Amino acid sequence: MNVSQDTIYAQASEHISDFQFDNRVAGVFSDMIRRSVPGYTQIINTIGDFADRFVMPNTQIYDLGCSLGAATLSIRRQIQGRQCRIIAVDNSESMVARCQENLNAYVSDTDVDLVCGDIRDIDIQNASLVVLNFTLQFLPPEDRETLIAKIYQGLNPGGILVLSEKIRFEDAPIQTLLEEQHLDFKRANGYSELEISQKRSALENVMKPDTLITHQQRLTSQGFSHFSLWFQCFNFASMVAIK
């Protein structure tokens, strides 16, 4: 798969529109997320490992906010022969179209239902694994608990939710430190100060990170009895919750 370089914010613009997962972003998303999210490849690979451990035969897997299908592909590689179905959902037509191309490039006996729609409208049932990989942060904060409740209800006992998010910190010095470390990560991956600044402006109104404790409290309040942070690099984290 050819990966185009992300130069979306390389030219100065007087008006920065809110970030959207449109055709421009879909075309460079693989490069964008690799250069922007520390540990992304490890997260994707480990989601596959979790699938191998937790996915039961004849159950369903949900990848909510599937983007180009990286998590779905990682899962599918690990669950051959289990007669499972993956439901991969994204609300961006451009992302879904490119995701379908990526899925078509690999042969598998695991069916994938690729849905262009709102993850809040998806019926979740008979699930052994649900993935929210850098998705919840883009939902309105008031809708997040309702979605987590729906996921919990749709998971079978022993099923898991993998939740990856950018997080924020109540401790101001820690927030500043880890935010600066993340900016250094982006600089080291070739993003200019202009690109970093304009991307930040684009995301300001559409991505609202929670604290780690907010995530944990939300999950436990909806019934998850087992929770752990399993990955963190700077202000990016991935959590696992078991029903």
Curated annotation (Swiss-Prot):
GO function term, MF aspect, one? S-adenosyl-L-methionine binding
Q: Where does S-adenosyl-L-methionine bind?
A: Y40, G65, C66, S67, D90, N91, D118, I119, N133, R200
User: Which region is the signal sequence?
Assistant: none
- Pfam families assigned: Methyltransf_25 (PF13649)
- Kindly indicate whether the keyword Oxidoreductase belongs to this entry: no
Q: What is its EC number?
A: 2.1.3.-
- The top EC class, named as a word, is transferase
Say if the entry is tagged with keyword Transferase.
Answer: yes
One biological process term in Gene Ontology: tRNA wobble uridine modification
Coiled-coil region list: none
* InterPro entries reported for this sequence: CmoA, Methyltransf_25, SAM-dependent_MTases_sf
From the UniProt record, list the reaction(s) this protein catalyses. prephenate + S-adenosyl-L-methionine = carboxy-S-adenosyl-L-methionine + 3-phenylpyruvate + H2O
- Keywords assigned by UniProt? S-adenosyl-L-methionine, Transferase
Q: Which PANTHER family match?
A: CARBOXY-S-ADENOSYL-L-METHIONINE SYNTHASE, TRANS-ACONITATE 2-METHYLTRANSFERASE-RELATED
Subunit structure as annotated in this protein's UniProt entry: Homodimer.
Q: Give the similarity note.
A: Belongs to the class I-like SAM-binding methyltransferase superfamily. Cx-SAM synthase family.
Task: Read off the NCBIfam families from this record.
Answer: carboxy-S-adenosyl-L-methionine synthase CmoA (TIGR00740), PRK15451.1 (NF011995)
Role, per record: Catalyzes the conversion of S-adenosyl-L-methionine (SAM) to carboxy-S-adenosyl-L-methionine (Cx-SAM).
**Protein name, per record:** Carboxy-S-adenosyl-L-methionine synthase
What is the phylogenetic placement of the source species in the record?
Bacteria, Pseudomonadati, Pseudomonadota, Gammaproteobacteria, Alteromonadales
Q: Gene name on record? A: cmoA
